[in-house]
Regions:
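Interfacial juxtamembrane loops and adjacent helix segments
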Residues: 101-188
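Membrane-lumen/periplasm interface segments of multi-pass, membrane-embedded glycan/lipid transferases
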Residues: 319-406
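Transmembrane-helix signature of polytopic, membrane-embedded enzymes
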Residues: 7-11, 180-183, 201-222
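Start-transfer (signal-anchor) and selected internal transmembrane alpha helices
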Residues: 2-75, 303-311, 414-419
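Membrane-interface alpha helices of multi-pass inner-membrane proteins
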Residues: 226, 261-277, 282-288
């Protein structure tokens, strides 16, 4: 277990690092009135000190540490992050508001007085779209009461399952019930999503018999908390993947696997996989569990056959989700840009050398982008990033992976097999993006979901 024997020493290091990076970003941004930045420095300094002190008193209960750290820094993030400034948060928030009404599915309906279709929501939700990127200090939209006048938006992530927005929907519903200002729909939606993420992570770390500290490190990455403290369902997806991985660690170490735990593992895998299909491959982790750990031969066989069940559910959902994906601005975009999964596959089959080249780009071009996404905050319009910090995080992870010692480590054979599953999932993520987002023949340039990828690595 990693311990902070001298908390004063680490508090000093934290204060020094925070000061250096604050000065660096202040210099780059050239703030004329840095009063707010000074205030945030003080808040982060206090939050960091409290976190270090709490860790020193609870370093044997890392699930509690994770819960506290995620909530503390998540609350800071959810209030500071500008309106709709998380990737695709506009659409995520529209879906959250729809779910808050009790509508678990979505209806793609004609927009009155137009020839277009869209999703029915309320005026306050679409008003925020005009103030995207603004914070509460430079817009008055947050001062308005909730406007329930029907409004329409062209996309609502209809391809995502409803459970990805239940927590956010509860927050939006509560803001409506309490008749709060409109901004509280966004803030409470973010807050309940954060609580769900923190709760699942706490359960995951508590369940894992080994590698608790690495799971803690991955779960509190800035990009992880940034996503969790938004209305995006990506935070839930990451939490479910980490939960599934923690149950694998439990299976690997327990002398007798319970049916209940096996069921929870597959539920986590399926729920995660329906949000991001390639992660259904997490079910393959069951092959890394020693056969002697299953209660009997029957359980061993059923556990492995359940992989086919998970795959079948994933394929069935993907067929439905693909049709829903076109019911948005993406439908017209795909037509204009000639984006077609079947067309892309035919193109690659007809050009095997290009297919090999594209596969190579997954590692030569996309992998550096994944590393850069360790510190990348964007909604595709406004970007806040730092290659320096991304590089430092990558170096930290490399050093941590090499020097972190655990007396109950996984053996080399299991690590090799786990690495192959990581390669399969990573390649699957890149392949799905290539087939569904890029036009025919375009180079592989996209990369995402570095939180879970870093966990598996």
């Amino acid at each position: 277990m990693f311990k902070l024997e001298n908390k004063k020493y680490f508090i000093g290091i934290y204060a020094l690092i925070l000061s250096l990076f604050s000065l660096y970003f202040t210099y780059r941004a050239n703030f004329s009135n840095p009063e707010f930045e000074v205030l945030m420095f003080c808040i982060l300094l206090i939050a960091g000190i409290l976190s270090i002190v709490y860790y020193t008193k609870n370093n044997e209960k890392l699930h509690k540490v994770a819960l506290v750290l995620i909530i503390i820094f998540g609350i800071i993030s959810l209030f500071l992050t500008p309106i709709y400034d998380v990737s695709d948060e506009t659409e995520h928030f529209v879906r959250s508001e729809i779910v808050s009404t009790g509508e678990l599915s979505t209806n793609y309906v004609p927009i009155p007085n137009t020839t277009a279709n869209g999703y029915k929501t309320i005026a306050s939700v679409t008003t925020f779209f005009d103030n995207a990127g603004a914070n509460v200090f430079n817009t008055h939209a947050d001062d308005d009461k909730i406007d329930h006048t029907p409004s329409y938006f062209n996309s609502a992530f209809a391809q995502n399952p409803f459970y990805g927005y239940l927590a956010q929907g509860i927050g939006v519903f509560l803001a409506k019930c309490l008749d709060l200002n409109a901004i509280w729909m966004l803030w409470l939606g973010r807050f309940f999503n954060l609580l769900l993420y923190a709760g699942i992570i706490a359960v995951a770390i508590k369940k894992a018999p080994v590698f608790k500290f690495p799971l803690l490190i991955v779960s509190i990455l800035p990009i992880a908390i940034y996503q969790a403290a938004s209305t995006s369902c990506d935070g839930l997806f990451s939490a479910l993947a980490i939960l599934a991985f923690s149950y694998f660690l439990y299976f690997y170490k327990t002398p007798k696997i319970a049916w209940t735990d096996l069921g929870i593992f597959y539920i986590a895998v399926i729920l995660c996989g329906l949000l991001k299909t390639p992660y259904l491959a997490l079910s393959l982790l069951i092959f890394l569990v020693p056969n002697t750990n299953f209660s009997d031969k029957k359980q061993n066989i059923i556990a492995k056959l359940c992989i086919l069940v998970a795959l079948g559910i994933g394929i069935a959902w993907s067929s439905y989700a693909t049709t829903q994906l076109a019911n948005s601005w993406r439908g017209e975009y795909f037509i204009q840009k000639n984006v077609s999964a079947s067309g892309q596959i035919d193109y690659l089959l007809a050009n095997p050398l290009i297919a090999l080249q594209r596969f190579g780009e997954i590692y030569s071009t996309a992998l550096p982008t994944v590393i850069d996404r360790f510190f990348y905050f964007s909604n595709s319009v406004r970007e806040y990033s730092s290659t320096l910090l991304a590089g430092l995080y990558f170096v930290f992870f490399c050093l941590f992976s090499v020097f972190y010692c655990n007396s109950e480590d996984l053996n080399l054979k299991t690590r090799v097999k786990g690495f192959l599953i990581f390669v399969l999932i990573y390649s699957g993520v890149m392949a799905v993006q290539y087939l569904t987002c890029l036009q025919l023949g375009e180079k592989m340039l996209q990369a995402a979901y570095s939180v879970v990828i870093s966990c598996l690595s």
